[in-house]
Amino acid sequence: MKTGLEIIAAERQRQIEQEGWTPEHDAEHVNDEMAIAASAYALPDYCRHIVKHYDGYPKEVSYPRGWPWDAKWWKPCPGNRIKELAKAGALIAAEIDRLMNAEMKAHGIDTEKIKTDKESE
């Protein structure tokens, strides 16, 4: 059985490989979007304030209040709290990485060189 940390790491890897949410892409989200999205997935369903609207289409779209992106990116997993918490954890990990990379760049540290050095080990 996998640990929570392993499940979160696997979800983060899936986000990068299948969704294309790379560190370079994440660097564009400078307004806490990933942390906000993580908090939405971390809340149990009964605590989410769902906004319902028609968004110009006859089909109703639902997503949590404060959701930082287009409604199409809200992908809850009803009945699977582990999967939702894995998404939340992976988004938090991505936000931590983004903040650390931004801090290193602000101090003149080349994050690409660090990544290259790690890959060659």
Regions found by a protein language model. Name each.
Residues 1-121:
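Intrinsically disordered, low-complexity regulatory regions
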